[in-house]
Design a protein with these regions (language model features):
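Short, surface-exposed interaction patches in beta-rich subdomains
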Residues: 70-168
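Acidic (Asp/Glu) and glycine-rich low-complexity loops/linkers
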Residues: 1-45, 51-64, 75-80, 93-97, ...
Length: 168
């Protein structure tokens, strides 16, 4: 159950379960309805976009190497991992126990409506990360980007420029 596209393509998928969505090029993929499973990887290499309505996965991974965007309107999961290495953006909402959010390029991760118990956020590029952490937050900025967070985590570890990590 893998979707893959390399040319200008628009795919609307409504499946009870998927393992991977892999876009190379400018394809657009819309995941309609509720899709459930254990592991789901969303991968964009190029300018394509992925939009998902409702994902219920134990482990959700989202990767962008290019200018494409990923928009997840609602996720329920244990682990959410996102890495942006290009100029694309990730917008993700929902709940997770643990989230690892990384920006290595100029793209942004907007996850301030993703309620996660523990969050690790790292910016080594010029992009920005915003998110919500309820218990533990580890934030590191080594590039020119910024990290903003919501919530009131009891454990807060910050590394980077003094003004680069702030509460929203």
């Amino acid at each position: 159950k893998i979707l893959s596209g390399e040319r200008r393509l628009k795919v609307i998928a409504s499946s009870p379960s998927l393992d991977e969505v892999d876009i190379k090029g400018s394809a657009d993929v819309y995941l309609k309805g509720t899709i459930k499973g254990v592991d789901l990887t969303l991968n964009i290499t190029g300018s394509g976009d992925i939009e998902a309505e409702n994902l219920q996965y134990t482990n959700l991974s989202a990767y962008i190497k290019g200018s494409g965007d990923i928009d997840v309107k609602n996720v329920k999961g244990t682990t959410v991992k996102t890495i942006v290495s290009g100029s694309g953006d990730v917008n993700i909402k929902g709940t997770a126990k643990w989230a690892a959010l990384t920006v290595n390029g100029s793209g942004d991760i907007s996850a301030d409506k993703l309620a996660a118990t523990e969050v690790i956020a790292t910016v080594s590029g010029s992009g920005d990360i915003s998110w919500y952490a309820s218990k533990q937050l580890d934030a590191k900025v080594s590039g020119s980007g910024d990290i903003e967070y919501k919530g009131n985590p009891s454990i807060l570890n910050k590394q980077g420029r003094k003004d680069s990590i702030s509460r929203k």
